[in-house]
């Protein structure tokens, strides 16, 4: 398994040898495209953004190792080994608290564990670092829905729509949340 994870991390890194300025420029360009793309093209752009986010921004040994750890944690999360994934993402955050994707992954694990308040705190950290993180904003919508803060959830999804207009989650969730609010007032 460790060898497979190393291969995955190295394949991500093979195409990622860009400096921070180039990375930010690439993200800015992709976000402009995302805002104006139809659904099919937007999914391709979304995948490119996720790829950039999933690679640590520093092109040194430490950055490669942190990327490798993120891949390991993601694998554990996919295998439903949530406590192990939580530990790995926490290690990454200790080493580099400025990498938004480590916070985002840990927020996801916390959500899956039903620890919604803690998940929201991690989402707040993601959004301090990367305010355009549509994954974190969409996750915030889910967290706020679980906490029965339906207006906050709607606002999160509206923020997603500003960044990623063709994303399906807001189109599905906003009407559902409006129904929940309506049902509460009866």
Walk through the language-model features, giving the residues of each:
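Sec-dependent signal peptide recognition
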Residues: 2-8
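TPR-adjacent "capping" and linker segments in tetratricopeptide-repeat scaffold/adaptor proteins
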Residues: 21-22, 52-68
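Terminal, low-structured helical/coil segments at or just beyond the last alpha-helical repeat
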Residues: 36, 55, 59, 155, ...
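Alpha-helical adaptor scaffolds
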Residues: 63-130, 135
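Register position in tetratricopeptide repeats
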Residues: 78, 112-113, 146-147, 176-183
